[in-house]
From Swiss-Prot:
It catalyses: alpha-D-glucosamine 1-phosphate = D-glucosamine 6-phosphate. This is Phosphoglucosamine mutase. Its EC number is 5.4.2.10. The lineage of its organism: Bacteria, Bacillati, Bacillota, Clostridia, Eubacteriales. Keywords: Isomerase, Magnesium, Metal-binding, Phosphoprotein.
């Protein structure tokens, strides 16, 4: 792992790339960097349900305590819950052990600053440099100066109460199927919905350490789509492993993606005078239908790179408070400092309740243009992306689309993949283009 930090912290195969030794080093370096500027000398740690979380958590705790910083352990909790508690508990930093939607063999370590925001690149670089430097002179306190380990017994309760308070309506009369991805949402998502009055049918809510994201959750919503229809539910919700995203399913079993959720939430916020700057921040992956739907409603759309950290940066830069990604990472900055699948689900459900419309009716406000995505595994994604062959191929195929579509080729921020997206009106033409682009990328 030549460069540790990617777009969403440090990721790798647990115990080969992301080892206990590396976690220990990251704990030492992170605690030193994030608490030396007068910030609180306590760090909170939370994780998802992966089997490797125990090992990495123990190593991080040891590293943090070894530089004289206290650890407050909160156990399994959604990533946005850790961001929230970092702020609420007055910690100098928060640490999340999770690889989000990735398979079980992967894990990750991500830091939040004292305000609950992901770290800027320069702080991550400082932590990385110290973690990799065998000669780094970090503190080695002794005796009573060592850090201690504490347990936050009511962490789940605190996050549940916080999330519930973000909407002013109950959910009585709604029958909801919720897919917890056998991940961090398993204890909180069904409970929150139930306490707000919904009839809740949880699925994939029994984590065993190895079944996280396994044919379930927001990256595999097929079972949820079937279950919503089978149960006669009003809608379904699908979280990923760390519950920082959500997708929905209407009563007919149709998937409602992040773009559609953003359109209906943005329009509802605007109708209540609560859409700050009359702006929604989206990424280059958002569907053309989103742009058209928001433009029809007189809402300004600001575009940024893929990744919720870039959505957040653009929100802070523009003063807007709402934005997100097609994948279901959606930020309501008036509520939390990062993408929050639980809070997004609650805002969506509040729109359903307050408008009296079904999710199918609401989602129909956006016409989704056909979009085909394809991932190509590569050895060196940067080499591929810098090849002039790619830019020439994009120009050639976009000429064929004649202004009625677009092609986007980008590297994954967390995996050795190049992602291809082709969008337009003719599915056969799109499939032909994406297959040809994938072949070109694979041969570079």
């Amino acid at each position: 792992m030549a460069k540790l930090f990617g777009t969403d912290g440090v990721r790798g195969v647990a115990n080969t790339e992301l080892t206990a030794e590396l976690a220990f080093r990251l704990g030492r370096a992170g605690a030193h960097v994030l608490t030396r500027q007068g910030h609180s000398k306590k760090i909170i740690i939370g994780r998802d349900t992966r089997i490797s979380g125990d090992m990495l958590e123990a190593a991080l705790v040891a590293g943090i305590c070894s530089v004289g910083v206290d650890v407050y352990k909160i156990g399994v909790l959604p990533t946005p819950g850790i961001a929230y508690l970092t702020r609420k508990l007055g910690a100098g930093a928060g640490v999340v052990i999770s690889a989000s939607h990735n398979p079980v063999q992967d894990n990750g370590i991500k830091f939040f600053g004292p305000s609950g925001y992901k770290l800027p690149d320069e702080l991550e670089s400082q932590i990385e440099k110290l973690a990799l430097d065998d000669q780094a002179e970090l503190p080695r306190p002794t005796g009573g100066e060592l850090g201690r380990l504490y347990y936050v017994e009511d962490a789940v309760d605190q996050y549940v109460d916080f999330a519930k308070a973000t909407i002013s309506t109950d959910l009585k009369g709604l029958k909801i199927v919720v897919d917890c991805a056998n991940g961090a949402a398993y204890a909180v998502a069904p409970r929150i919905l139930s306490e707000l009055g919904a009839e809740v049918i949880p699925i994939f809510h029994r984590p065993d350490g190895v079944n996280i994201n396994a044919h379930c959750g927001s990256t595999h919503p097929e079972t949820l789509m079937e279950e919503v229809v089978k149960q006669g539910a009003d809608l379904g919700l699908a979280h990923d492993g760390d519950a920082d995203r959500v997708l929905a399913v209407d009563h007919l079993g149709n998937l409602v993606d992040g773009d559609q959720i953003m359109v209906l939430c943005a329009k509802h916020l605007k109708s209540k005078g609560k859409l700050r700057k009359n702006t929604t921040v989206v990424t280059v992956m958002s569907n053309l239908g989103l742009y058209k739907a928001l433009e029809r409603s007189g809402i300004e759309v600001v575009e940024t790179k893929v990744g919720d950290r870039y959505v957040l940066e653009k929100l802070l830069e523009t003063g807007a408070r709402f934005g997100g990604e097609q994948s279901g990472h959606i930020i309501f900055l008036q509520h939390n400092t990062t993408g929050d699948g639980i809070i997004t689900a609650l805002q969506l459900l509040a729109v359903v309740k307050e408008t009296g419309m079904s999710l199918a009716q609401l989602a129909g406000q956006m016409e989704r243009y056909p979009q085909i995505l394809k991932n190509v595994q590569v050895k060196d994604k940067n080499y591929v992306m810098n090849s002039p062959i790619i830019s020439e191929a994009i120009r050639r195929f976009e000429r064929d689309l004649a202004g009625q579509g677009r092609i986007l080729v980008r590297p994954s921020g967390t995996e050795p993949l190049v992602r291809i997206m082709v969008e337009g009106k003719d599915m056969a033409e799109l499939q032909s283009i994406v297959d040809k682009m994938a072949e070109i990328v694979g041969n570079i």
